Curated annotation (Swiss-Prot):
Described function: Required for genome encapsidation. Forms ribonucleoprotein complexes along with TGB1 helicase and viral RNA.
GO cellular component, one term: helical viral capsid
Source taxonomy: Viruses, Riboviria, Orthornavirae, Kitrinoviricota, Alsuviricetes
Disordered: annotated span: 1-27
Name of protein: Coat protein
Ranges annotated as biased composition (Low complexity): 7-27
Superkingdom to which the source organism belongs: Viruses
Family the entry assigns: Belongs to the potexvirus capsid protein family.
Keywords carried by this UniProt record: Capsid protein, Helical capsid protein, Ribonucleoprotein, Virion
Location in or out of the cell: Virion
One Pfam family hit: Flexi_CP
GO molecular function, one term: structural molecule activity
Organism: Potato virus X (strain Xc)
Ribonucleoprotein found in the keyword field: yes
Keyword Ribonucleoprotein: yes
Amino acid sequence: MTTPANTTQAVGSTKSTTTTTAGATPANSGLFTIPDGDFFSTAKAVVASNAVATNEDLAKIQEIWKDKKIPSDTMAQAAWDLVRHCADVGSSAQTEMIGTGPYSNGVSRARLAAAIKEVCTLRQFCKKYAPVVWNWMLTNNSPPANWQAQGFKPEHKFAAFDFFDGVTNPAAITPKEGLMRPPSEAEMNAAQTAAFVKITKARAQSNDFASLDAAVTRGRITGTTVAEAVVSLPPP
């Protein structure tokens, strides 16, 4: 492909001048290269998500865990145990880990989580292993412990953990056999609804007053009430 050009000839002259048209597309090279079918069939994309811990994050966490004397041959199991525990208790920054898992050489889950938070969020780490925990829970028919407290129906109970969307994230680590079954549309809807409720309640507990004058606050410490914060969802 050649660069489009504008050929003009001066009046009273036999000499032609060639000028490049402003804004013309340069030759098919560099950043102006146009992909063809071969590219799409052969190119390899590295899947990454800012919602999921990266492989670089895992490498850093692994080194910290080594310093804490977590055995290399059970390190993966220690991670899976921690994430399975988070499916029960939550993966927010405020969540308190309970006890010590059987694969961490006596290092508590709280210390494992603290090491993770030096590199990424606990939820990002949990989403990395969400497919592993999903299969684990289904295999043992053991849903997240707090599914009833969160208001989930029995048929949606396996979706009752706050990093559920990591189960289908392509950046997560999936077992060799794949998912035992994909999450159903009803489970995904239930998980999204639970997340919405948590966010709404959290916002209702925050102070959104622009003034501390009693005429504005009416003596309330928090801002918007739960009833005011809830947005009515359209009927199905």
